[in-house]
A protein has these predicted regions:
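Phosphate-binding and adjacent anionic-ligand microenvironments
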Residues: 1-69, 75-103
């Protein structure tokens, strides 16, 4: 999924989200009763949960948008919870618009 984000803002938004998720990890935040066990910050952020489920946020390289991907090895419900977690963080920035598709 790709929510709209101005080209001049998208890298700042991703940087802000990286900092927020890193902070939430240190606080032991749970997403659908799963803690964040790993964070990779190459070209954005990918975080993994205890059960192997994950979420990813990065800036699109060729259009004014972000790329949001979620995956769960256990359930569609967990995949949606990860998306809701990411979406809430993005909405709080006030710099992200509508998605190009729905989950």
């Amino acid at each position: 999924m790709a929510p709209y984000c101005k080209d001049e803002e998208k890298y700042k938004v991703v940087s802000e989200i990286v900092k927020q998720i890193q902070k939430l990890k240190t606080q032991g935040i749970k997403i659908d009763n799963q803690i964040i066990i790993e964070i990779l910050t190459v070209n954005g952020i990918r975080f993994s949960l205890e059960d192997g489920s994950w979420g990813l946020i990065r800036a699109s390289s060729n259009k004014p948008s972000l790329v949001v991907v979620t995956e769960s090895t256990t359930s569609e419900s967990r995949k949606r919870k990860i998306f809701e977690f990411i979406d809430n963080l993005l909405k709080k920035t006030g710099k992200v618009g509508k998605y190009d598709q729905k989950i």
